[in-house]
Amino acid sequence: MVGGRYGLSSKDTTPGQIIAVYDNLEKDEPKNNFTIGINDDVTFTSLDYKEIELPHPGQISCKLWGLGGDGTVGANKNAISTIGFVGGKYAQAYFSYDTMKSGGLTQSHLRFGDEPILSTYLVSSADFVAVHAPTYVKKYDTTEDLKEGGTFLLNCPWTCLLYTSPSPRDRTR
């Protein structure tokens, strides 16, 4: 019998990590009491994994960065409901919050399309990324999860991206 833990420190479990579990089970001597989702540099029980991008033709995925209390999460809940109920699309939304309620980091992960959505993890490859707190472009890699050819929207008072160096200007056109 082999067992392990996941979801430690509220970390999301990704398809790449699940594949690592199955790869571990196929070994002659699989690692027991393993962990996925964190880098365990104390007991070294983490399984190595490679992130993969699962194709979902016709599905649109979005990741929106907000500031707790700015209305981003509420607006996204309304938007995904409208897309699903009024637009007749399959729709899914996950929301993650910082420990601070007001003023903390919020992330909205939205998916919608014409086929049922079976993804049970956060968006890590987005067609659309929006950032509603201009300071986030220096604090976080807000374009990390943007697909090649995806759309990046920065809600800011600036007229030029020169103020955001090095990110996201270096990854956008």
State each model region's role:
Residues G7-K11, G66-G74, R173:
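Gly/Ser/Thr-rich loops at beta-strand to alpha-helix junctions
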Residues D145-L162:
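ADP-ribose/adenylate-binding Rossmann-like module
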Residues M1-E29, L122-Y136, T142:
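Phosphate/diphosphate-binding loops
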Residues L8-S61:
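Flexible inter-domain linker/hinge segments
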Residues S61-S125:
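Anionic-ligand anchoring segments at beta-strand to alpha-helix junctions in alpha/beta enzyme folds, i.e.
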Residues V137-K139, C160-L161:
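Short glycine-rich, flexible loops that bind phosphorylated cofactors or substrates
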Residues Y163-R173:
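Single conserved hydrophobic/aromatic residue that forms the stacking wall/gate
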